[in-house]
Amino acid sequence: MRLFLSLPVLVVVLAMVLEGPAPAQAAPEISRTFERIPDKLKEFGNTLEDKAREVLETIKQSDIPAKTRNWFSETYNKVKEQLKTAFS
């Protein structure tokens, strides 16, 4: 039953895709596209910057860096003590 329903839907979707864009959806002039590239790149850069700042602030506010630093310090001190006792 599912196959009978999915095949016509698949055929309709495939026909729409192969038909191509409608005339109203045709690509604008290439010069307009090139004119908008710097604006799009600036917008992309701004959103990327904002997201990176949010991530960094989240990391700074969390206690993960402090816990990681403490764990490395403790592990380093343990290894150092073990080496001292082993080679003494």
Curated annotation (Swiss-Prot):
Which GO biological process entries does UniProt record here?
lipid transport; lipoprotein metabolic process; negative regulation of cholesterol transport; negative regulation of lipid catabolic process; negative regulation of very-low-density lipoprotein particle clearance; triglyceride metabolic process; very-low-density lipoprotein particle clearance
InterPro entries documented for this protein: ApoC-1_sf (IPR043081), ApoC-I (IPR006781)
**GO cellular component term, pick one:** very-low-density lipoprotein particle
Q: What does this protein do?
A: Inhibitor of lipoprotein binding to the low density lipoprotein (LDL) receptor, LDL receptor-related protein, and very low density lipoprotein (VLDL) receptor. Associates with high density lipoproteins (HDL) and the triacylglycerol-rich lipoproteins in the plasma and makes up about 10% of the protein of the VLDL and 2% of that of HDL. Appears to interfere directly with fatty acid uptake and is also the major plasma inhibitor of cholesteryl ester transfer protein (CETP). Binds free fatty acids and reduces their intracellular esterification.
Matching Gene3D superfamilies: Apolipoprotein C-I
> Where does this protein reside within or beyond the cell?
Secreted
| Family the UniProt entry places it in | Belongs to the apolipoprotein C1 family.
UniProt KW keywords: Lipid transport, Secreted, Signal, Transport, VLDL
**Organism encoding this protein:** Ailurus fulgens (Himalayan red panda)
The entry's protein name is Apolipoprotein C-I
One function term, GO molecular function aspect: fatty acid binding
Does the entry feature the keyword Metal-binding, yes or no?
Answer: no
User: Where does the signal peptide begin and end?
Assistant: 1-26
